[in-house]
């Protein structure tokens, strides 16, 4: 049987369905595919799970993490958030979700503000997070080339900022939201980036 050599992994968004990625990662662990991965690109839920895979989370760790999550804690819509919608552009600030992401990052790396360049240096993986730049009306990949000193938790928060649900995120004076708005599965971008030939 021909062995599979996965070098570039692209993960789409999908809301709570993103939890299914831990099953994929279990299969990857069993087949020892993860050691050959050179880049991980993710949007929305794919950005969360792709980032955790990049920093070394195992299937068992991710499974325990998901089981411990209380999803209602990350989406708190109340009267005030509805009344302030015209100012905030979202019913939920995303603060609790960002705190959770930062905690996950710190537990594994020791640094909740680890940047794209530090991820590349420490784990030898090019992590890329897909976002929608609302200011420039275009899809972007945030990575160690475009945003080397950006903490990945901020990029993840931008990528999961579903329009009208979560407030958009400001990075370097540009306004960002869920990468899935313009390209939920940026596989063509990755193919062109690495000149992958079918």
Residue ranges and their predicted role:
Residues 1-43, 51-198:
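Patatin-like phospholipase
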